[in-house]
Amino acid sequence: MPSFLRGILKPKERHHENKNHSQMSSDSLTSSYPTSPPKLEKTEAGSIVSSTTQKKTSHHAKPTITTKTEQSQRRPKIIDQVRRVESLGEQVSQKQRHMLESLINKVYTGPLGEELVQTLYLRIWAMKETPESTKILQMREDIRDQYLRMKTERWLRTLIRGKKTKLRDFQKRYEEVHPYLMIERVEQIIMEEAWKLAAHIVQE
C-alpha cells in the first residue's frame, strides 16, 4: 500500500510518528521515475497516445510501403505472359487463325494428336530427369496425354499470334523465352514439337 494511503487509514495519534517516514518513502518513489513524463499527443479519433509509441509505429511502417511501391512498379516478365496465353492476344489474320484452330482441333481429336503425345512421351522419357519430367512420367496415361495436348496448345497459341505471324516473329518470340527454356527442358521439348506442327502456317 502506498505511504500516502497508509497515513490516511492509521489512527490520528500515530499520524505524527509516521509523518517523516511517509515523506521519505514518497521522495524515494518520486526519484525512481523520470522527472518529465512522455509527451502525449491527440489522435484523430480523440484518444491520447504516447509520442514515443507513435514514432515506433511509423518507423516500422515505412519498409512495408516501400516494398508495395516496388512491387507495383515491377514490370511483368515475358514468361508470365507465356503462362497466361490469353494475355498475349489471339491471331488476327483470318487465314492463319482458321489454320491454327484447325490444327489445335486435330491435336485433341485426330491421329495427329496421338502421334504427338507418343513423341513427347518418348522424348521426355529419354531426357535427363527433372522434377517436371518425373511428374509427367508418373501420371496415368489418359491424364498425361491430355496434359501434353494442353501444353502443346498453349505453345501453338504463343507462337502463332498477332496480325500475321512470319518467321522473323517466331525468331523474336523464341529469343524472349530462351532463358526460360534452358531451365525448363520439358517446356523446350513441347515448344519444339509445337513449332514443327505450326511451321506450315507461318510459311504460307
From Swiss-Prot:
Keyword annotations of the record: Host-virus interaction, Inhibition of host innate immune response by virus, Inhibition of host interferon signaling pathway by virus, Inhibition of host STAT1 by virus, Inhibition of host STAT2 by virus, Interferon antiviral system evasion, Viral immunoevasion
Organism annotation? Human parainfluenza 1 virus (strain CI-5/73)
Q: What is this protein called?
A: Protein C
**Keyword Membrane attributed:** no
Location of the region described as Disordered in the Swiss-Prot/TrEMBL record = 1-78
Start-end of Low complexity biased regions: 25-34
Q: Which family does it belong to?
A: Belongs to the respirovirus protein C family.
Transmembrane regions listed in the UniProt entry: none
* Record-level GO BP terms: symbiont-mediated suppression of host innate immune response; symbiont-mediated suppression of host JAK-STAT cascade via inhibition of STAT1 activity; symbiont-mediated suppression of host JAK-STAT cascade via inhibition of STAT2 activity; symbiont-mediated suppression of host type I interferon-mediated signaling pathway
Pfam family example for this protein? Paramyxo_C
Q: Where is the composition biased (Basic and acidic residues)?
A: 10-20
